[in-house]
């Protein structure tokens, strides 16, 4: 029986940066922390200068002849590089259109689930297509569907801007939201705003309380 292949479960070896004593070239072209060219000097001389400045000697161009090093604060340099990489990744995010579907008779719990989904999509930088689906004769209730979508836009106003108001699309009613680009300016207190909101959300079925008996 052939032996079973073994998998190396060890963590991959991280490539260490070429700084200070890890630089093995005898001659280096060195640039000081302020951008001044120190010319071609020996590795030991370059390390002495870096130590005097209480900074690091960092290899920035290994393919040059001789290799180029710069004297700098490597910790700060690494932080700035990681920050730039994160910003570039954020800018390269491809905006997608995510869809949130519901019925016009959606109950309160499911409605909050849809709100949570929309918030996650918006925070990721995506647009949200809010869709109310009609079945059969439910198409007669477009006014309730529009009211539901406007309520949703209101509840998401801190995270979203309406890019396309509610409109009919076949047997559905849709609305498009995009991530809010400017902070929301509220004209009314939060409690007053909430008190004015109304939503045609179906209540879960339950027993109707019996009227109190007259004395």
UniProtKB/Swiss-Prot annotation:
Primary location group: cytoplasm
Composition-biased stretches (Low complexity): 200-215
GO cellular component, one term: membrane
Keyword presence, Ligase: no
Biased composition (Basic and acidic residues): 184-197
Intrachain disulfide bonds: none
Region called Disordered, residue ranges: 159-215
Localization per record: Cytoplasm
UniProt superkingdom: Bacteria
Signal peptide positions on this chain: none
Matches recorded under Pfam families: IF3_C, IF3_N
GO biological process, one term: ribosome disassembly
Keywords: Cytoplasm, Initiation factor, Protein biosynthesis
Single GO MF annotation: translation initiation factor activity
HAMAP family, alphabetized: IF_3
PANTHER family, per database record: TRANSLATION INITIATION FACTOR IF-3, TRANSLATION INITIATION FACTOR IF-3, MITOCHONDRIAL
Primary role: IF-3 binds to the 30S ribosomal subunit and shifts the equilibrium between 70S ribosomes and their 50S and 30S subunits in favor of the free subunits, thus enhancing the availability of 30S subunits on which protein synthesis initiation begins.
Sequence similarity: Belongs to the IF-3 family.
Name of the protein in question: Translation initiation factor IF-3
Gene that this sequence comes from: infC
């Amino acid at each position: 029986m052939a032996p079973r292949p073994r998998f190396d479960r060890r963590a991959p070896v991280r490539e260490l940066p070429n700084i200070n004593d890890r630089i093995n070239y005898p001659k280096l072209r060195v640039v000081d922390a302020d951008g001044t060219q120190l010319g071609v000097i020996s590795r030991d001389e370059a390390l002495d200068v870096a130590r005097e400045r209480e900074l690091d000697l960092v290899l920035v161009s290994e393919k040059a002849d001789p290799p180029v090093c710069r004297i700098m604060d490597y910790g700060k340099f690494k932080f700035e590089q990681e920050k730039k990489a994160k910003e570039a990744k954020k800018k390269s995010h491809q905006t997608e259109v995510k869809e949130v579907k519901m019925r016009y008779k959606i109950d309160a719990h499911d409605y909050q689930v849809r709100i949570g989904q929309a918030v996650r999509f918006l925070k990721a930088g995506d647009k949200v297509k809010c869709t109310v689906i009609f079945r059969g004769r439910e198409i007669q209730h477009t006014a309730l569907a529009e009211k539901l979508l406007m309520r949703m836009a209101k509840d998401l106003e801190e995270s979203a801007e309406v890019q396309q108001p509610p409109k009919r699309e076949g047997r559905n009613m849709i609305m498009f939201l995009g991530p809010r680009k400017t902070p929301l300016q509220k004209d009314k207190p939060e409690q007053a705003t909430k008190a004015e909101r109304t939503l045609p959300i179906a209540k879960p079925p339950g027993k109707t309380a019996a009227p109190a008996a007259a004395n």
